[in-house]
Amino acid sequence: PLEGLALAIKDEETIKGLPASSGSLPLKDYIGEETTFIAERCFNAGAIMHARTTTPEFSCAGFCHTKLWGVTRNPWNLDYTPGGSSGGTGATLAAGAATLGTGSDIGGSIRIPASCSGVVGFKPPYGRNPQGHIFNLDFYCHPGPMARSVADVALLQNVMAGPHSRDIATVKPKMVLPLEYKSIK
């Protein structure tokens, strides 16, 4: 379902063989040993990783700034923030540099950048998407989709969602979001 679509992946998600710093200067040379479940599902569905996106150090801020990358700017107005901690994804989508993006949310880290950047983000309920091995693995962190439209977020969420054999917290059965709403007038 994602064949050939450009995907922006938040830097906290590891991809085997590629750098993943979680926005931290001490981790700037870290190379992923495994690919997170979310990224793996997107790749298996045909998405093409187009960008790695900025995040504040260890995804712990409502705006994106690090000693590693500096300040991430909102493409609609460079004096404004794209929010955080998935602000790099929000800015990438708002600039039109990718069609889809990954984020994660504890206290607004998908919702804040979506609002600041004029894109759509969805924090799924805990257990809908497998956690994998992101840095701040805990019960409050929910990986989720971001895109420029509700339809694209639903499409990406349907790819991300579902049980995973290595995450016992994933909810069964898989819940699928409808991609068409014919009964709504």
Task: Give residue ranges: language-model regions.
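Residues forming well-ordered secondary-structure scaffolds
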Residues: 33-37, 87, 117, 148-151, ...
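Structural signature of FAD isoalloxazine-binding scaffolds in flavoprotein oxidoreductases
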Residues: 111-116
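A short helix-breaking turn/cap at a secondary-structure junction
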Residues: 120-185
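A generic signature of intrinsically disordered, low-complexity regions enriched in glycine/proline
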Residues: 15, 78-81, 109, 146, ...
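Gly/Ser-rich catalytic/binding loops embedded in alpha/beta enzyme cores
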Residues: 1-106
